[in-house]
């Protein structure tokens, strides 16, 4: 992590590269066969004592366990990395007790789960699922770094970005342990939350354009203040999301978490605002209801404040329901070990969704 900003391991940063090297050594020390796949995921395989299928090792059954080691700036200490280290501990336990599994076990550090400067989260798992498009791979950040080039730099080949992993039919299950990132388990006194679904996550760029002017000489009734229009939208979104969450009785949230004001001067009426909407829904109906009302909110604000409001879709990941059979196995395992468990929807996105 960055020494002066824990816990910070941005994807492709020197801290990320160092952590990847440490993890690869830890995988190898546990007897795992390590490789980096075409999408830049670090994978350590514990091979089962099975015969190849038609001479092909890739045709064997396998289970994937893992998470991610990258973070947001000043992120959580256990966010992501707990799932990778827990998966590695599973391997240590199997080795120490000489337990052979009837399938290959893959421990995965998925590349770049957190939202990054290229505007897309879950890079590795999206690539594995054939969802990392050429347009996304071709994006360039402010420093001129192309996403595809960074994946290649760390060992990926950037091939097959529009196709699902070739042995997907042989994957029996994907498991990901993760911190809750909330306080429900703590406040209710439960040990484990068994996730029922990962919500759909949708991001939109909102551009509000008015007219910059001198704050001292521009009359209040003759302003096209982009920030005031943006404030109208932000407040309305907050109220709308609260109403939908209550009425639908399902997980639904909407947040404006990033905002830029131009020219951004103390004595200047703001002429332009760029902001990002993050909307998450466990219900397709709730999503549709929100978007319909959101369109009206933007149109009304534009009319009232004499500004132009444009909305651009940035990213989308649909609702991912979890497998009922695996949920039951987790519930049974918790009971056998005397652990209190409840079922809940995940509010956060995860690699397993893809």
PLM features: residue spans?
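Short amphipathic alpha-helices in soluble, non-transmembrane regions
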Residues: 290-299
């Amino acid at each position: 992590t960055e020494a002066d900003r824990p816990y910070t391991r941005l994807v492709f940063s020197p801290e990320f590269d160092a952590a990847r090297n440490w993890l690869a050594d830890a995988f190898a020390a546990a007897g795992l066969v390590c490789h980096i796949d075409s999408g830049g995921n670090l994978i350590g395989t514990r091979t089962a004592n099975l015969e190849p299928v038609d001479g092909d090792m890739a045709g064997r059954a396998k289970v994937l366990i893992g998470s991610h080691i990258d973070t947001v700036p000043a992120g959580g200490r256990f966010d992501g990395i707990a799932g990778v280290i827990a998966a590695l501990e599973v391997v240590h336990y199997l080795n120490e007790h000489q337990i052979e599994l009837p399938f290959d076990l893959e421990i995965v550090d998925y590349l770049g789960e957190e939202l990054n400067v290229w505007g897309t989260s879950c890079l590795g798992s999206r690539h594995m699922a054939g969802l990392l498009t050429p347009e996304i791979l071709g994006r360039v950040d402010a420093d001129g770094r192309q996403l595809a080039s960074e994946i290649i730099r760390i060992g990926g080949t950037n091939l097959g970005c529009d196709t699902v992993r070739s042995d997907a039919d042989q994957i029996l299950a994907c498991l990901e342990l993760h911190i809750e990132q909330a306080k429900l388990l703590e406040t209710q006194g439960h040990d484990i939350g068994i996730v029922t679904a990962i919500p759909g996550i949708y991001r939109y760029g909102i551009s509000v354009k008015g007219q910059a002017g001198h704050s001292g000489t521009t009359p209040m009734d003759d302003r096209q203040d982009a920030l005031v229009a943006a404030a109208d939208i932000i407040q309305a979104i907050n109220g709308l999301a609260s109403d939908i969450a209550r009425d639908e009785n399902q997980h639904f949230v909407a947040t404006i978490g990033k905002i830029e004001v131009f020219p951004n001067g103390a004595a200047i009426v703001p002429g332009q605002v760029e902001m990002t909407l993050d909307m998450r829904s466990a219900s397709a109906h709730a999503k549709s209801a929100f978007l319909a009302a959101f369109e009206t909110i933007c149109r009304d604000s534009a009319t009232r404040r004499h500004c132009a409001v444009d909305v651009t879709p940035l990213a989308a990941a649909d609702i991912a329901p979890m497998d009922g059979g695996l949920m039951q196995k987790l519930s049974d395992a918790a009971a056998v070990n005397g652990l209190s468990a409840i079922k809940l929807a995940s509010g956060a996105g995860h690699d397993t969704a893809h």
